Each structure stands twice: as C-alpha cells, then as structure tokens.
Regions:
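Active-site metal-coordination segments of metallo-dependent hydrolases
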Residues: 1-9, 124-131
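Pan-zinc metallopeptidase signature
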Residues: 45-200
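Post-HExxH zinc-binding segment in Zn-dependent metallohydrolases
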Residues: 2-46
Length: 200
C-alpha cells in the first residue's frame, strides 16, 4: 500500500508540475517515459500472472520437479525475449539523444541495471514490483474523483491525503476491497482483487 501510494503521488503530481514549469520537449520526454513504463508494467504483470497460474495448477495437481522447472524456464525465456524487443526499440529511439560519451555511458549504466534485473528475475522479483504498481491506477482514479471535476487544487489534495490516511488505518482485507472498488473498469484488476472476489 505505502509503495503504491508513493508511486501514485509521483505519477499524479509530476505531470501537473511539468505542465506549468517545463518545456514542451521535457513534457514530451516524460510522456514517452510513461508509455515505456506502461509497456514494462504490462510485460511484468503478464509474466507474474503466468507464474501464478503455474503455481496454482501445481498446487492442484503437482508436477515433478523437472516438468515444473521446464515450464517456468519457458515463461522466463518468453519474458526475456519480449524485454529484448522493447529494449531494442527504446535504444533506437534514444540514440539521437546520446550526444556525448558521458550521456551514453550514463544511459548504458542505467540500462544495464534493468538488464541485470531481467536476467535474475524470479517469482519474488515480480511480487516486489507489484507492491509499487498494483494500486496506483485505483489511487489515481480516486484522486480524480476527489477533485470534483475541478482543476487540481490544495483542497483536492487534502481530500485525497485524508482518504489515503483512512485507508491506511483499515484492516488489510477491508482496504483491498476499497481499492478494488476504485480500480478503473478499463484496466485488468490486480491479482489481489481477483483473490478477494474468489474468497467465500
């Protein structure tokens, strides 16, 4: 919850600040970064869902270790291959911006960190990512509702923070139900919402 809240505030507040303080080029670069983030999130969530499905099937009808390892290996291989495609697109698009050796080195160092994460990723890695992303869409949607159709204002932010403090004080199951209720309909719900719905 706390991780998603921090991420939600960043993604809500940053474009508001950029619209009034940044150049059009800077705003466009930020929007491009958000598009890339969305593609990355889709890929990691898709992979996490596939792994979750494997573990559920294995719990219902256990596989031998070799068969389970082979299935998981295929999932991670698919993940790495799809990341490689995204990576190639990003590098090609960013090449004109790497106008000095220093910029290129910094860029490649940041990219290498993601490369290393992808190479080492396991089920726990995807679970950690979910902590930062699962509730961001619900919180952003909630923030929009609390603005009452008006431009962002201090009063709107106060209402949002008050609502988030109330959420933080709830029991985890109740908090999950509230967040699931505010998940935008056009987006696939987090796994926690599906588990909550399935629970008797």
């Amino acid at each position: 919850f706390n991780e998603s809240f921090a991420t939600a505030v960043e993604r809500i507040a940053t474009p508001l600040w950029l619209q009034t303080h940044a150049s059009e080029a800077t705003l466009q670069r930020w929007q491009q970064a958000q598009t890339r983030r969305a593609l990355w999130q889709h890929l990691t969530r898709q992979t996490r869902a596939r792994l979750h499905s494997i573990y559920e099937r294995n719990a219902a009808q256990p596989l031998d270790e070799k068969a389970l390892a082979a299935i998981k290996k295929e999932v991670f291989s698919d993940f790495q291959a799809q990341y490689a495609q995204l990576r190639a697109q990003w590098v090609a698009a960013d090449e004109p911006l790497l106008t000095s050796d220093t910029l290129r080195q910094q860029y490649l160092e940041r990219l290498a960190q993601t490369d290393d994460w992808v190479a080492r990723a396991n089920n726990a890695s995807f679970g950690a990512l979910a902590a930062y992303d699962d509730w961001v869409a619900a919180m952003a949607h909630w923030w929009t509702q609390l603005q009452n159709g008006q431009p962002a204002s201090p009063e709107g932010w106060k209402r949002f923070y008050a609502q988030m403090r109330e959420l933080a004080s709830m029991q985890p199951e109740q908090r999950t139900q509230q967040l699931c209720a505010h998940q935008p309909e056009q987006l696939a719900p987090p796994a926690a919402c599906q588990a909550s719905t399935a629970r008797p």
